[in-house]
């Protein structure tokens, strides 16, 4: 809780930032390149042994991408590496879920750039809720698979008897997308 990530550069083949069951988080002015995994991912897993939301999170002025590993840091911005072994496309996106037992509340993503990666994903499949989500002023360039992906499902990695999740009050506005597959 009470986490600030500001002006960081991460270039990896794993999740860049993996925020789980946290509140009062600010991620700003970060550049995250992750061709084989998610750049910035919010989760609300059941790892603590109880339900806990991820809430009051602001992600702003960030750049996420799926260029070759290491090429962002060295400035070459290459796209020569084979795709991720488990799928034929680059990842490098901002994502809420899929680990979603507790849920997500009061999340803002604004003024971010997605480049050569998958788009924005909002997913709740483990019984959690997604509510009061504000996505605005996003630029997407060379996006593969889906520019915006919403998923409400029932994978249910929560304790038995947990009801299905829900999505409420999600606002997505001012999206500029170029070259989206």
Where are these regions (language model features)?
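Extracellular/periplasmic carbohydrate-active domains that bind, remodel
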Residues: 1-181
């Amino acid at each position: 809780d009470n986490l600030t990530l500001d002006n960081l550069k991460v270039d990896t083949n794993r999740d860049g930032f993996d925020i789980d069951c946290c509140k009062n988080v600010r991620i700003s002015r970060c550049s995250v390149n992750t061709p084989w995994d998610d750049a910035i991912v919010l989760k609300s897993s059941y790892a603590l042994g109880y339900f806990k939301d991820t809430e009051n999170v602001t992600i702003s002025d960030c750049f996420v991408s799926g260029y070759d590993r290491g090429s962002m840091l060295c400035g070459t911005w290459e796209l020569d590496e084979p795709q991720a072994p488990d799928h034929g496309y680059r990842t490098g996106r901002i994502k809420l879920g899929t680990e979603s037992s507790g849920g997500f509340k009061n999340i803002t993503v604004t003024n971010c750039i997605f480049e050569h990666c998958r788009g924005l994903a909002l997913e709740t499949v483990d019984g959690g809720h997604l509510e009061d989500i504000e996505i605005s002023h996003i630029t997407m360039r060379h996006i593969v698979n889906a520019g915006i992906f919403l998923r409400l499902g029932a994978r249910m990695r929560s304790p038995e008897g947990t009801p299905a999740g829900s999505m409420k009050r999600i606002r997505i506005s001012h999206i500029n997308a170029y070259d989206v597959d």
